């Protein structure tokens, strides 16, 4: 990213080397020297050309032709080019690959230039600074972020974050502990990250740009932000005490302004975020709940894809933001729910019809502020402002909803802006200014006059053709125009003897001659000059129009925010009505009480197959803090846990929820430990990932947290896993005291309520039918009677010989267990009979939970049993399931041989 120019000695050396090249290549090399780390799109006529290493890289990334033409300094010039008119599609591909591109345009006039036409870089396209509609995803925001770490005089290290959505002008700051950086990056998901040397960044799939440390100077950052906002103090914005974040903001704003080649007029405010504002969601929770992305990386089915019936792209982006930022303070969520209720009562059809006609005001406004709005941006903006009264009319009465009242107020039409657009912009303007027809008639008298001259050409040519036919007697004489030869009179060879003496030959064809006359030549000069002058005048007027619209940026941003908010509320109202959701009740008591709750996404998937979803209750309170959930795989344990978390999250967002009734108390964080996956890139095994996530929960969960623990301890040996699961559940009850859903196949844990009355057993039941099994998916009190592992394995397609061998061995194991006499040595959780160890780390004697007996098995048989016990069909991909089948078949063969 060429933000720094070469020093004087370096530049002198570069100039000396450049002097041995052609003038055009000298110009290219000078510009390229200022942007060494970016691809340079060098405009030459109707193409952007790339040279040398840039050409090779672009040819490889874009699959375009690499050629070599001519030579400069005795070296063939490697080059690759793309058409100017299709540059956006190539830019989109490069940006997606994390590349930055400097756009170098011709700013001089080729007709008057001596030597190479003057060129300069007008903007730099990077992954985090996109504003063009063709380069941006419609329904997701693109953020540029700067990260800066600072150590205070007391030795306390703070990490400052500043991030900017250049396509909307939204700027945010926050400071956090270094350990929280990964969680914040996962929440914000920047497209590009700016950082200085010395900072440790967690793994994140985004472009990274390193800047010198001095770019992050706190004092310079403070001055830069004050200058950007036009204020003398940042205290009213809540920036007092922020040091590292202000340094990051300075680097961010300077970088963004440099890429755009101008000031950021639409960045007119800053919001300081505090960790205490939002319900904490770590990366594992966002992934496991599939808020906006499935576990396999898809866009659907997710909570966002289910809820996104928004009518505008602005609304979809706002909905995505709401889902990733549930609020701790219930005031705003309750205001949203009140507005949704009003919209349901009034009906949303008319409002949704009105919203569908609106353009993306948010992004058009940003392009307008950056002076790169296109003609159809302005016509779309005009039509949207015209339609605002229709939107307001669809809300008959806000019925006391402060949010709807505020939205209606913010939708006030910026009349001066609308009047200017109506007067200045043609009803259906051309796509680009250079094609003409953008400025409306009547806006400028000079332009109208030039257009009249140009547009009256047709009548003049008809009149001239009629007169010349009469004068010459040539009945098939034609007067026409083309871009190469201009105006001409065409006469066929058979009529050549009738051509008058004042005709001058302009072009010879196979069967005709083309001529020019003094009268036609004079008209040509006048008409072509008028057309060129009209286009030049129109470009001048268009640039002036953009400048005249700049004072209205704030009003347009206000309108965009109101439209996005109203669109989300309308979509949530439609979803609540269509899907039969209810308004949750928010209370001060520490409680999660859900009656007939459903998983929103799974219910939608089942409905598509005409299958009813089984609703379930979930009660968590001070007397019932942890639910031990047992039952078979595929019985619905994970679905029950996830639906509880999603209902709580939706309540904190301000949406209605998929339940007959829901009472939700204060929630500060939602944690999930669900599923099994290793982290090969990070060098962590499945069990290590599991324990790392569990450690994070145990360190940070509070009594106001909701914790989901699924199959903890399964990644290691049976006794290790059981011991860990027991200790973790006990710690959550005695120390964290969080609302906890704890799913397990360790039936020994079901005795935990004997020690902790705040724990309760529930199970998801199933019924055996012959050799098969029917899952009831209903949550019932008490522990499950068995796991139905063999039946699930049979459903998964495990070969029958394996199932028969496993069933035979299971019967033997159960008989051995029944015949065995328990001894103290086999009591896994009993305290050793020594007076020094009669208390555990929690200050209380451990509960005596009987452990399973361990019969003696042949190694081959033990391997088969362990493989079956550790099999979790809920988490298997089709490929993994197939591999598991082959592995089980091989183990079964070995077990049968051993028997």
Swiss-Prot record:
PROSITE patterns: DNA_MISMATCH_REPAIR_2. InterPro entries: DNA_mismatch_repair_MutS, DNA_mismatch_repair_MutS-lik_N, DNA_mismatch_repair_MutS/MSH, DNA_mismatch_repair_MutS_C, DNA_mismatch_repair_MutS_clamp, DNA_mismatch_repair_MutS_core, DNA_mismatch_repair_MutS_N, DNA_mismatch_repair_MutS_sf. The keyword Cell inner membrane does not apply. Keywords: ATP-binding, DNA damage, DNA repair, DNA-binding, Nucleotide-binding. Residues 1-20, 832-852 are annotated as: Disordered. ATP binds at residues 631-638. Signal peptide: none annotated. One of its GO terms (biological process) is mismatch repair. Residues 843-852 have a biased composition (Low complexity). One of its GO terms (cellular component) is cytosol. The keyword DNA repair applies. GO terms for molecular function: ATP binding; ATP-dependent DNA damage sensor activity; damaged DNA binding; mismatched DNA binding. NCBIfam families: mutS1 (TIGR01070), PRK05399.1 (NF003810). Belongs to the DNA mismatch repair MutS family. This protein is involved in the repair of mismatches in DNA. It is possible that it carries out the mismatch recognition step. This protein has a weak ATPase activity. This is DNA mismatch repair protein MutS. It comes from Cupriavidus necator (strain ATCC 17699 / DSM 428 / KCTC 22496 / NCIMB 10442 / H16 / Stanier 337). The lineage of its organism: Bacteria, Pseudomonadati, Pseudomonadota, Betaproteobacteria, Burkholderiales. The gene is mutS.
């Amino acid at each position: 990213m060429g933000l720094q120019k070469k020093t004087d000695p370096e530049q002198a050396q570069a100039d000396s080397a450049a002097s041995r090249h052609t003038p055009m290549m000298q110009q290219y090399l000078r510009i390229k020297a200022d942007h060494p780390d970016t691809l340079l799109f060098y405009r030459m006529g109707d193409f952007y050309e790339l040279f040398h290493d840039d050409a090779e890289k672009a040819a490889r990334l874009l699959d375009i032709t690499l050629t070599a033409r001519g030579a400069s300094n005795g070296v063939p010039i490697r080059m690759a080019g793309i058409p100017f008119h299709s540059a956006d599609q190539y830019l989109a591909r490069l940006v997606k690959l994390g590349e930055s591109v400097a756009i170098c345009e011709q700013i001089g006039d080729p007709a008057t230039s001596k030597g190479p036409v003057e060129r300069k870089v007008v903007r730099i396209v990077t992954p985090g600074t996109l504003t063009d509609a063709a380069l941006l995803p419609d329904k997701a925001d693109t953020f540029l972020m700067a990260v800066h770490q600072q150590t205070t005089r007391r030795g306390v290290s703070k990490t400052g974050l500043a991030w900017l959505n250049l396509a909307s002008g939204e700027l945010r700051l926050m400071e956090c502990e270094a350990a929280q950086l990964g969680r914040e990056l996962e929440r914000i998901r920047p497209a590009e990250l700016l950082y200085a040397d010395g900072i440790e960044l967690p793994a994140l799939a985004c472009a990274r740009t390193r800047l010198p440390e001095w770019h992050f100077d706190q004092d310079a950052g403070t001055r830069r932000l004050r200058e950007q906002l036009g204020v003398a103090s940042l205290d009213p914005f809540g920036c007092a005490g922020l040091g590292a974040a202000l340094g990051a903001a300075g680097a961010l704003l300077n970088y963004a302004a440099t890429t755009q080649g101008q000031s950021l007029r639409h960045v007119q405010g800053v919001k300081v975020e505090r960790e205490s504002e939002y319900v904490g969601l770590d990366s594992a929770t966002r992934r496991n709940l599939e808020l906006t992305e499935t576990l396999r990386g898809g866009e659907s089915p997710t909570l966002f894809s289910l809820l996104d019936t928004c009518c505008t792209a602005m609304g979809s982006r706002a909905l995505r933001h709401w889902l990733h930022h549930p609020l701790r303070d219930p005031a705003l969520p309750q205001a949203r729910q009140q507005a949704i209720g009003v919209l349901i009562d009034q009906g949303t059809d008319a409002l949704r019809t009105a919203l569908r006609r609106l353009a993306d005001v948010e992004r058009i406004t940003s392009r307008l502020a950056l002076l790169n709005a296109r003609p159809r941006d302005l016509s779309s903006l005009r039509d949207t402002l015209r339609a605002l009264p229709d939107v307001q009319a669809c809300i008959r009465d806000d019925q006391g909803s402060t949010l709807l009242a505020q939205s209606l107020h913010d939708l006030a039409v910026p009349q001066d802006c609308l009047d200017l657009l109506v007067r200045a912009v043609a009803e259906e303007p051309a796509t680009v200014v250079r094609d003409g027809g953008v400025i409306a008639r009547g806006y400028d008298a000079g332009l109208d006059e030039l257009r009249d001259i140009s547009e009256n050409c047709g009548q003049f040519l008809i009149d001239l053709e009629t007169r010349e036919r009469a004068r010459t007697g040539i009945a098939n004489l034609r007067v026409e125009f083309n871009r190469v030869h201009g105006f001409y009179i065409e006469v066929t060879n058979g009529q050549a003897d009738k051509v008058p003496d004042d005709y001058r030959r302009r072009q010879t064809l196979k069967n005709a001659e083309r001529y020019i006359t003094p009268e036609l030549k004079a008209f040509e000069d006048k008409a072509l000059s008028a057309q060129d002058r009209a286009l030049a005048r129109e470009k001048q007027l268009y640039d002036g129009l953009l400048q005249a619209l700049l004072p209205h940026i704030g009003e347009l941003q206000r309108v965009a925010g109101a439209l996005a908010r109203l669109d989300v509320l309308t979509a949530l109202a439609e979803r609540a009505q269509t899907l039969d959701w209810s308004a949750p009740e928010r209370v001060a008591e520490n409680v999660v009480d859900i009656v007939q709750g459903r998983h929103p996404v799974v219910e939608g998937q089942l409905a598509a197959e005409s299958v009813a979803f089984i609703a379930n209750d979930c009660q968590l309170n001070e007397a019932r803090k942890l639910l031990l959930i047992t039952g078979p795989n595929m019985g619905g344990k994970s679905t029950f846990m996830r639906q509880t978390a999603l209902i709580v999250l939706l309540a904190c967002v301000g949406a209605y929820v998929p339940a007959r009734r829901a009472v939700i108390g204060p929630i500060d964080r939602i944690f999930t430990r669900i599923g099994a996956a290793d982290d090969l890139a990070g060098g962590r095994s499945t069990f290590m990932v599991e324990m790392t996530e569990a450690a994070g929960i145990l360190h940070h969960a509070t009594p106001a947290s909701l914790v989901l623990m699924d199959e903890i301890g399964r990644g290691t040996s049976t006794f290790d896993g059981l011991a860990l699961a027991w200790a973790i559940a006990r710690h959550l009850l005695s120390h964290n005291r969080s609302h906890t859903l704890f799913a397990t196949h360790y039936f020994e844990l079901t005795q935990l309520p004997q020690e902790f009355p705040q724990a309760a057993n529930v199970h998801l039941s199933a019924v055996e039918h012959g050799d098969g099994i029917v899952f009831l998916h209903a949550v019932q009190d008490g522990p499950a009677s068995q796991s139905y592992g063999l039946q699930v394995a049979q459903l998964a397609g495990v070969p029958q010989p394996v199932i028969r061998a496993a069933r035979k061995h299971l019967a033997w194991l159960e008989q051995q267990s029944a015949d065995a006499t328990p001894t103290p040595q086999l009591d896994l959780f009993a305290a050793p009979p020594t007076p020094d160890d009669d208390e555990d780390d929690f200050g209380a004697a451990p509960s005596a939970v009987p452990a399973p007996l361990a019969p003696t098995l042949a190694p081959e048989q033990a391997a088969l049993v362990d493989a079956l016990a550790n099999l979790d069909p809920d988490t298997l991909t089709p490929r993994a399931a197939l591999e598991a089948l082959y592995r089980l078949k091989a183990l079964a063969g070995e077990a049968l041989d051993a028997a």
